[in-house]
Curated annotation (Swiss-Prot):
Sorted UniProt keywords: Antiport, Cell membrane, Ion transport, Membrane, Potassium, Potassium transport, Sodium, Sodium transport, Transmembrane, Transmembrane helix, Transport
Family: Belongs to the UmpA/UmpB family.
Gene: umpA
Subcellular location: Cell membrane
Subunit structure: Heterodimer composed of UmpA and UmpB.
Organism from which the protein derives: Vreelandella zhaodongensis
Tagged with keyword Isomerase: no
pH dependence: Optimum pH is 9.0. Exhibits antiport activity at a wide pH range of 6.5 to 9.5.
Entry function: Part of a two-component antiporter that catalyzes the efflux of Na(+), Li(+) and K(+) in exchange for external protons. Shows a preference for Na(+), followed by K(+) and Li(+).
Record-annotated membrane-spanning stretches: 18-38, 41-61, 87-107, 133-153, 160-180, 192-212, 225-245
Membrane topology (UniProt): Multi-pass membrane protein
Name of the molecule in the record: Na(+), Li(+), K(+)/H(+) antiporter subunit A
GO cellular component term, pick one: plasma membrane
Main location: membrane
């Protein structure tokens, strides 16, 4: 009975969170544009899509609360108590890499980026080249997030100052921007945002809080957060480096 009540509350919260987006889109469609929906978008499909979003978001968030959050924190505590730093770092990398590869936002952005880059002439204008670019971009971003989580875990262990590391990261970003292809700069900067989405953020946050709660002398509020900041800046650095040195990895690059 408790799970039903909890799901009902979460459903209400999801409706409340999505309502502003629906109202904004409806206002501009009906009041500003003043045009009916296109023929390709049936009203029934629109309503069903909104229902699927609300139900899916509700189940996703509840699943995180019931399973992935506790599991991530418990694994972090178990690795620390076992004293296996090497395995913890391997787990941190695998968690960052795996959650990012599965990120729906990254999959969508990578596919669109492949189309745009091929149109710009940076790679061949073929479906194979676009698919190769999209796949390579996803791997680069996933590797960067895995690396970022490892760096963040080391920061929690060592107590390194977060602000100095983030400042250094963005200085590197600015320097690499001077040498990266113009067509990839926007994609690189956006890659830092798409990685901090529905899957990556909860898992990485659970890991950080679990570690900071277990390591003696660490404060979960001060040290447990900040991994997402690394997961935002590191993809920018990696994608810029990919643009400078790694485009030859893409099938059909020019």
């Amino acid at each position: 009975m408790n799970i039903v009540y909890s799901l009902a509350n979460q459903l209400k919260d999801s409706l409340r969170d999505l309502l502003p987006v629906v109202l904004v889109m409806g206002f501009f469609q009906l009041v500003v544009i003043r045009q009916p929906l296109p023929d390709s978008l049936a009203l029934l499909d629109l309503v069903l899509g909104l229902v699927f979003v609300v139900v899916g978001l509700t189940l996703f968030i509840k699943g995180l609360e019931l399973g992935l959050f506790p599991l991530g924190e418990n694994l972090a505590r178990a690795f620390v108590k076992k004293g296996s730093v090497a395995w913890l770092l391997i787990f941190a990398f695998a968690l960052g890499f795996g959650s990012t590869v599965a990120e729906p936002a990254l999959i969508a952005v990578a596919a669109r980026a492949g189309e745009v880059v091929s149109e710009s002439g940076l790679i061949a204008d073929t479906s194979a080249a676009q698919a190769s670019f999209a796949f390579t971009l996803r791997m680069v971003v996933a590797l960067s997030v895995g690396t970022a989580v490892v760096v963040g875990v080391l920061r929690i262990f060592k107590g390194w100052p977060l602000h100095l590391m983030i400042i250094a990261g963005y200085i590197i970003v600015l320097l690499l921007t001077l040498f990266a292809p113009n067509e990839l700069i926007g994609i690189a900067y956006d890659s830092g945002g798409v990685t901090t989405s529905t899957i990556t953020v909860p898992l990485v946050t659970a890991l950080g809080v679990g570690l900071a709660s277990t390591i003696k002398g660490r404060n979960p509020m001060l040290d447990g957060f900040g991994l997402i900041a690394f997961a935002s800046v590191m993809p920018i650095i990696f994608v810029l480096l990919f643009g400078i040195f790694g485009l030859s990895l893409v099938t059909g690059s020019t």
